[in-house]
């Protein structure tokens, strides 16, 4: 097995160690391997390929980190065909929350989420993806 080196803030490392201890992992490497497999598998779900999807992406960042807000604005414009709606809110005193509602293909949503994940200084990124056609019956009710 290859050995890799990963840089992360001390606080995240402490959380990783605590998580490993609390959940019975043998160490950091096992946690990172499982997290990596889960991350890579998130958008490899064959049931979603070729279907129209909707997604919600939530990003939280420190309000003083203006580079993140600028990046979010840039991504919103760069992916205007994908972003159906966008909402910005101030939360918790020192934080901003950016919420994106997306509608598009698995590939386009994957690309968008990947670009957000690559944005430096975000605190949390959360998302969910659902097929639009699963709600077709609800839309037909008169």
UniProtKB/Swiss-Prot annotation:
Pfam annotation, one family: NikR_C
Record carries keyword Methyltransferase: no
The keyword Protease appears for this protein: no
UniProt record, GO biological process: regulation of DNA-templated transcription; response to nickel cation
Cofactor note: Binds 1 nickel ion per subunit.
Sequence intervals crossing the membrane: none
Gene Ontology molecular function terms on file: DNA binding; DNA-binding transcription factor activity; nickel cation binding
Cofactor(s) required, per the database record: Ni(2+)
Residues annotated as binding Ni(2+): 77, 88, 90, 96
Keywords: DNA-binding, Metal-binding, Nickel, Transcription, Transcription regulation
Quaternary assembly: Homotetramer.
Function, as annotated: Transcriptional regulator.
Record family assignment: Belongs to the transcriptional regulatory CopG/NikR family.
PANTHER family: NICKEL-RESPONSIVE REGULATOR (PTHR34719), NICKEL-RESPONSIVE REGULATOR-RELATED (PTHR34719:SF3)
Name of protein: Putative nickel-responsive regulator
Phylogenetic placement of the source organism: Archaea, Methanobacteriati, Methanobacteriota, Stenosarchaea group, Halobacteria
């Amino acid at each position: 097995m290859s050995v890799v080196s990963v840089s992360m803030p001390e606080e995240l490392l402490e959380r990783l160690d605590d998580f490993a201890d609390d959940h019975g992992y043998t160490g950091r490497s096992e946690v990172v391997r499982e997290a990596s497999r889960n991350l890579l598998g998130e958008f490899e779900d064959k049931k979603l390929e070729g279907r129209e999807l909707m997604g919600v992406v939530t990003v939280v960042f420190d309000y003083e980190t203006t580079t993140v807000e600028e990046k979010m604005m840039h991504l919103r414009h760069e992916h205007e065909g994908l972003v159906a709606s966008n909402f910005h809110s101030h939360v918790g005193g020192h934080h901003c929350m950016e919420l994106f509602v997306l509608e598009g293909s698995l590939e386009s949503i994957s690309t968008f989420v990947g670009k957000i994940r690559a944005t430096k200084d975000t605190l949390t990124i959360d998302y969910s993806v659902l097929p639009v056609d699963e709600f077709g019956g609800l839309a037909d009710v008169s």
